[in-house]
């Protein structure tokens, strides 16, 4: 602690130095505050602690009598603005750099290898649904062989079904008559022409059936007269033979070994009609 006499001497010395500074510079500029004041020397700290006993030790006190030289002053604020401190550089290095709009991940590049698109994408992910490729499916389901086997079986079955459908359309196309025989038709045209051709065949079959049902009535009515004609001709032939036998003359003595010469009556042939003729 300083005695009262030392306090008075220090106070008078500080007053005199202050007056001298004010006289030398009538309008002094306010002292520029250094950007980062350097550490105080040991002598200044000891002098402050000894001359200001009413303050606790370690409290910085500005002493006008012990100023630093002009050459040792810190750079001005203008230069320090271009050279930021290490703390500011560390803070800027930790923050993520801002990206422009065209540097953000594009939603079309969203895949297993690149990862999902960020929140700053041009389009929302809910509106764009891209079908994953075979390589991505193999990579995602590589540890699940059951899914891989099921997918392979489904693909082969679909391929087999498509081949059979195409083969059936090709066979149906061969049965359809077209003006250019080698004209290429789509599946829709093949089905439409097949319907028309089937309808034409149905109408043609109905017409043929109607002609066959109405035709045999006329020949059936002509059969009975033909039978009667056969019966009449048979009867006419039998009567003609009877009349010829009757008109044949009988010679005298023409007897079969009859010594008396008596004439025997000639037996008339009575022809009976067979049941077939009747």
From Swiss-Prot:
Its main location: nucleus. The keyword NAD does not apply. InterPro entries: bHLH_dom, HLH_DNA-bd_sf, TAL-like. Residues 149-201 form the bHLH domain. It is found in: Nucleus. Residues 27-37 have a biased composition (Pro residues). This is Protein lyl-1. GO terms for biological process: B cell differentiation; blood vessel maturation; definitive hemopoiesis; positive regulation of DNA-templated transcription; regulation of DNA-templated transcription. Residues 1-46, 212-278 are annotated as: Disordered. The keyword Transcription regulation applies. Efficient DNA binding requires dimerization with another bHLH protein. Keywords: DNA-binding, Nucleus, Phosphoprotein, Transcription, Transcription regulation. Gene3D superfamilies: Helix-loop-helix DNA-binding domain.
């Amino acid at each position: 602690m300083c005695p009262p006499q030392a306090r008075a001497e220090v106070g008078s010395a500080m007053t005199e130095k202050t007056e001298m500074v004010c006289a030398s510079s009538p309008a002094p500029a306010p002292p520029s505050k250094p950007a980062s004041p350097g550490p105080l020397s040991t002598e200044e700290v000891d002098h402050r602690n000894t001359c200001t006993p009413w303050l606790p030790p370690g409290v910085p006190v500005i002493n006008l009598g012990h100023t630093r030289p002009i050459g040792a002053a810190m750079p001005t604020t203008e230069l320090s603005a271009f050279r930021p401190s290490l703390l500011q550089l560390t803070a800027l290095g930790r923050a993520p750099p801002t990206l422009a709009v065209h540097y953000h991940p594009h939603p079309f590049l969203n895949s297993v290898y690149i990862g999902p698109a960020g929140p700053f994408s041009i389009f929302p992910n809910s509106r764009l649904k891209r079908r994953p490729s075979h390589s991505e499916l193999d990579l995602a389901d590589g540890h699940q062989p059951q899914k891989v086997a099921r997918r392979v079986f489904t693909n082969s079955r679909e391929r087999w079904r498509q081949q059979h459908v195409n083969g059936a359309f090709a066979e149906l196309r061969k049965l359809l008559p077209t003006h250019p025989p080698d004209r290429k038709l789509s599946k829709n045209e093949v089905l439409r022409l097949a319907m028309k051709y089937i309808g034409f065949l149905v109408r043609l079959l109905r017409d043929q059936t109607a002609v066959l049902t109405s035709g045999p009535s006329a020949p059936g009515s002509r059969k009975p007269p033909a039978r009667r004609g056969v019966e009449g001709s048979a009867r006419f032939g039998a009567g003609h033979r009877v009349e010829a036998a009757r008109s044949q003359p009988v010679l005298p003595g023409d007897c079969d070994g009859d010594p008396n010469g008596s004439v025997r009556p000639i037996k008339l042939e009575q022809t009976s009609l067979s049941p077939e003729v009747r």
